[in-house]
């Protein structure tokens, strides 16, 4: 490898919106994510309601879809 052309590979903290913190290595100092393996519905087995109610209502209104 050539010297001084590659970014530094450092300890990194990945922080999830649920509060889970993961330490890993990356060229990025701090990473913030919205969903991790501790809160993702696939891994937890729980259904998590994402803020889509407004989008669904707007879609139905736009295309005149009745329930």
Curated annotation (Swiss-Prot):
Q: Which GO terms describe its molecular function?
A: metal ion binding; rRNA binding; structural constituent of ribosome
- Keywords from the named record: Metal-binding, Ribonucleoprotein, Ribosomal protein, RNA-binding, rRNA-binding, Zinc
Q: Which residues bind Zn(2+)?
A: 16, 18, 36, 39
Q: Which cofactor does it need?
A: Zn(2+)
UniProt GO cellular component terms: ribonucleoprotein complex; ribosome
> Looking at the Swiss-Prot or TrEMBL record, what is one Pfam family this protein matches?
Ribosomal_L31
PROSITE patterns, alphabetically? Answer: RIBOSOMAL_L31 (PS01143)
Q: List the disulfide bonds.
A: none
- Recite the UniProt cofactor note for this protein: Binds 1 zinc ion per subunit.
Q: Which SUPFAM superfamilies match?
A: L28p-like
Give the top-rank taxon of the lineage listed in the UniProt record for this protein.
Answer: Bacteria
So which residues are the signal peptide here? none
GO terms for biological process?
Answer: translation
Respond yes or no to whether keyword Nucleus is given for this record.
no
PANTHER family for this protein? 50S RIBOSOMAL PROTEIN L31, CHLOROPLASTIC (PTHR33280), LARGE RIBOSOMAL SUBUNIT PROTEIN BL31C (PTHR33280:SF1)
Q: Oligomeric state and partners? A: Part of the 50S ribosomal subunit.
Family of the protein in this entry: Belongs to the bacterial ribosomal protein bL31 family. Type A subfamily.
Q: What does this protein do?
A: Binds the 23S rRNA.
Q: What is this protein called?
A: Large ribosomal subunit protein bL31
Q: To which species is this protein native?
A: Treponema denticola (strain ATCC 35405 / DSM 14222 / CIP 103919 / JCM 8153 / KCTC 15104)
């Amino acid at each position: 490898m050539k010297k001084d052309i590659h970014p530094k590979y450092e300890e990194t903290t990945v922080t999830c919106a649920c509060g889970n913190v993961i330490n890993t290595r990356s060229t990025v100092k701090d990473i913030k994510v919205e969903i991790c393996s501790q809160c993702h519905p696939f891994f937890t087995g729980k259904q998590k309601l994402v803020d889509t109610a407004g989008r669904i209502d707007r879609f139905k209104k736009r295309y005149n879809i009745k329930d």
